[in-house]
Amino acid sequence: MKQKIAEKFQTLFLSEGEFFASAGRINLIGEHTDYNGGFVFPGAIDKGMIAEISLNGTNKVCAYALDLDEYSEFGLNEEDAPDQGWAKYIFGVCREIIKRGGNISGFNTVFSGDVPLGAGMSSSAALESTYAYALDSLFNLGIDKFELARIGQSTEHNYVGVNCGIMDQFASVFGRKGNLMRLDCRSMEFEYFPFDPEQHGYKLVLLNSCVKHELVGSPYNDRRASCERVAKILGQEFLRGATMEQLDAVKDQISEEDYMRARYVIGEEKRVLDVCDALGKGDYETVGARMYETHWGMSRDYEVSCEELDYLAEVAKECGVTGSRIMGGGFGGCTINLVKTELYDAFIEKAKTAFAEKYGHEPVVIPVVISDGARILE
């Protein structure tokens, strides 16, 4: 990938630049907890974005997206926003840095990625983090890492129109090889936890169902509103920290649907902490058990699964897979699977054939390894 970028850069700009990279991410457990002030447990992965960049002495950005074979040129003022969707990410990062007082000028760049698009692995956050990190480095801006993550998040909010949380950008910037990060979405404190499945005889693999169910209304916002209603009745800002005893005490004051949503979130909060404890003991069986619990909680209580993802989780269980669950917001996308190495090939074969027989296409198999986040590539 780096070689192809370098060749295109040389052809377009007749020069060489510096290389920067950032990563996509997985979230092992802790789904729909971020907007409830809870914990998430992401890690950066060995798939991401690479960009070559050199300053060009103008106030223009000349950018080429290698995978799309598209070129864009734009200025750095608010009114200079490019038309191409992908270019808005780079423009947004530039604008967010400028808004924070960063003094930057034009540059030439070529980028490419191997994060599968639409698989819930945060290709957009990887792109934002690559450029935020690169511009901070090239212009010696001294921006702290949390602010680099916020620059990516603000880019989504203000230039892409996606009201995302901080987890994706956080994982992309702070990712560390062989570690997951437990992020407290209320205090923004975080802690690294060693996670090396290979060393313990396991593999981590995503199965992309390649299904995305278009939904009527805004189910994401509906789930969030349910949680906020219950938190308010409990007299809390967030559901974080609420107990099942407290929830059961107000059961007759809330709808059955709101009760189910809150039950899932309270359970998920505990599952994240259980998984952290289990990893400390090298107990991957407990990690896997909690993953299955999360899947069926998301399916039955939070109702964000779909038939195809439930089927993949069932196939995983039948094949003796240690843990499997929906990853991401739901309604399609991937399952994340923790599989014993000796069962891996048989599981993948079974998942592909069984899924294809039932739904007419194979799931896409994406093995992942926990890796470093944003960095300079030598």
List where the protein language model places each region.
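A structural signal for short, well-ordered beta-strand segments
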Residues: 109-111, 207-209, 335
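Short, amphipathic alpha-helical segments that act as regulatory/interfacial helices
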Residues: 45, 94, 132, 228-231
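C-terminal nucleotide
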Residues: 1-25, 50-83, 182-323, 338-378
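FabD-like malonyl-/acyl-CoA
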Residues: 125-126, 334-338
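Short Gly/aromatic-enriched secondary-structure transition segments
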Residues: 37-44, 223-224
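Gly/Ser-rich oxyanion-binding loop with an adjacent helix/lid
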Residues: 1-20, 26-39, 73-77, 83-196, ...
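Short, charge-rich binding segments
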Residues: 42-44, 52-55, 101
